[in-house]
């Protein structure tokens, strides 16, 4: 299988698992990063169960073939599957938007690893009034050409970061959970998704399973389990001052974190999900014990970004559609609005 991955940062984790399973991968990234990867490959560190140290996985040692390209050099129609691993605002870039249009026109199935679900995926949910959610997106227009049945979405649960001082081709997986993918609306695309999932399942290193699997779920709502985590943790790491860790966001006010977590889950239920689609707060809180760094959205805001993924605003808007609101969600949205407006003013 030929897999195209837009975004060489987070996408490298998914790409490494594809390479282990014998699939060929192209990472789409900036020219300097593409040059680095084409010359030296990628290096992902994953800790196997029962081991204290992370194990190194170099792309040059894996079964599949890896290359990296800039978006304008990609032949979109030559791939079996595209994986969307950039943050939502990045798709407004002209060369990326053009590549998206080419993927849509070539009817290439697209699997999102974004925190922000692509708009065509949301179109598959009858309860959502699309006109009322587009304002949460930085570039809603880039999704107009897609067939919704060929767009699916993952809960991007694995946590990865670039170790301090390392180059752009190195990633360390800090929380090795699974990608939970909703089924596509198209049967042929689901065959591809199942084949990819099953092939990744067979991967072994020193006789052991390698963490970070791809799990296909029948429910379209399965990836939305991540929403509660984002609202109770990630977006509450944004403060009026320096960002805090997910651990601190959850444990410094655990009762409030649980409230936000449960209210966000209620929004998913009212959209049509079931309790089986959600993750209990206790399981999330246990995972948060080891999440001792600020998440990317909080770091980006602190570093002056004038635009970030607005999952907080999307969830607030969907909650209002289904009659579920909470003061802490409103506070989060207002604070993020304020911080990015201040960043925009400073950048002007």
PLM features per residue range, with description:
Residues 15, 34, 96-101, 316:
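Short amphipathic alpha-helical segments and helix-helix/interface helices
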Residues 73-118:
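Rossmann-fold NAD(P) dinucleotide-binding segment
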Residues 77, 111-227:
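Rossmann-fold dinucleotide-binding core
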């Amino acid at each position: 299988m030929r897999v195209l991955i837009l975004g060489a940062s987070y996408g490298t984790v998914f790409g490494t698992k594809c390479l282990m399973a014998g699939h060929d991968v192209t990472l789409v990234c900036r020219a300097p990063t593409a040059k680095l990867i084409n010359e030296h490959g990628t290096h992902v560190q994953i800790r196997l169960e029962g081991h204290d140290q992370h194990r190194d996985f170099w792309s040059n040692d894996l079964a599949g073939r890896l290359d990296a390209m800039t978006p304008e050099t990609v032949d979109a129609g030559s791939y079996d599957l595209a994986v969307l691993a950039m943050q939502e605002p990045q798709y407004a870039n002209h060369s990326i938007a053009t590549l998206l249009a080419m993927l849509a026109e070539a009817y290439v199935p697209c699997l999102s690893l974004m925190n922000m679900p692509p708009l065509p995926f949301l179109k598959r949910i009858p309860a959502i009034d699309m006109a009322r959610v587009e304002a949460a997106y930085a570039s809603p227009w880039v999704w107009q050409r897609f067939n919704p049945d060929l767009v699916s979405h993952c809960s991007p649960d694995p946590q990865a970061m670039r170790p301090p001082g390392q180059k752009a081709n190195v990633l360390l997986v800090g929380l090795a959970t699974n990608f939970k993918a909703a089924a596509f609306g198209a049967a042929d695309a689901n065959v591809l998704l199942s084949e990819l999932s099953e092939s990744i399942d067979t991967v072994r290193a020193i006789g052991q399973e390698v963490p970070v699997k791809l799990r296909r779920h029948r429910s379209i709502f399965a990836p939305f389990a991540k929403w509660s985590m984002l609202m109770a943790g990630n977006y509450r790491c944004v403060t009026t001052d320096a960002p805090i860790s997910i651990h601190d966001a959850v444990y410094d006010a655990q009762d409030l974190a649980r409230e936000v977590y449960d209210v966000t889950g209620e929004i998913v239920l009212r959209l049509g999900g079931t309790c089986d689609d959600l993750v209990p707060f206790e399981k999330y809180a246990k995972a948060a014990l080891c999440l001792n760094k600020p998440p990317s959205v909080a770091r980006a805001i602190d570093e002056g970004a004038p635009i970030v993924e607005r999952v907080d605003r999307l969830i607030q808007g969907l909650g209002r559609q289904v009659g579920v609101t909470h003061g802490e969600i409103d506070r989060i949205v207002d604070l993020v609005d304020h911080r990015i407006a201040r960043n925009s003013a400073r950048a002007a």
